[in-house]
Amino acid sequence: MVKVEYSVKKQDYKNRLQQEEEEKIVHQYLANEFYSGGTMFTVTNVDEQIKGNDCFYITDTSGYTIDEKAFVTYINIDIPTVALELSIINRGDKTQDGWFLNGNNTNNSYVFTNIVSATTLDLRSVEDIIETKTFLITKKAIYDYLASMGWNKDKLKAKCKRIWDNPNEPLERTNYDAHNKQDYLKFQRISHVDKQGHVEKSIILKLRRDKLIKHADIVL
């Protein structure tokens, strides 16, 4: 397989349904390359999927209920950060918790996948994927890491409210690394397209992958 010669950031015009198909391809790839050390069950029940449960993974020592996060809008780019969705303003102009803060989600872990090498920018099969950077981390481990920087769920929700209410609210930078020009933690406003093509606004929290991965249970 030959990696395409360039890196491109895919834009929001890419249909969300197409992204979901690519996420399924990534899941198939992970089933072969990442979950091979235990037993994995893919969740097909829609109600469970809505609760953030994409698969169950059982090893000799642990059991994980996993929400998979594959960055399919970035192919052939080694992304140095991981983004957690904190808050959403939906097309009805109503604010709701994002998947990281949503209390209705019952997953206890996340699997983050960055596709750093592929033969195409539009995945059509597992064979298109050459290499990923993937890690499994529990939700508790992320909250513990955030707590070490002074953040908990209530403070994150309060921060999101201030960001929505005030366009000038600072998007905080914690432990800025001047040498690498990266933050350990940073809030960001973004817009994305839902399945029906409507624009939704979100607040995400960006964390450095190299810092977060130190708290992971499994790394590929």
Q: Which residues make up each language-model segment?
A:
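Nucleic-acid endonuclease domains
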Residues: 1-52, 60, 64, 70-220
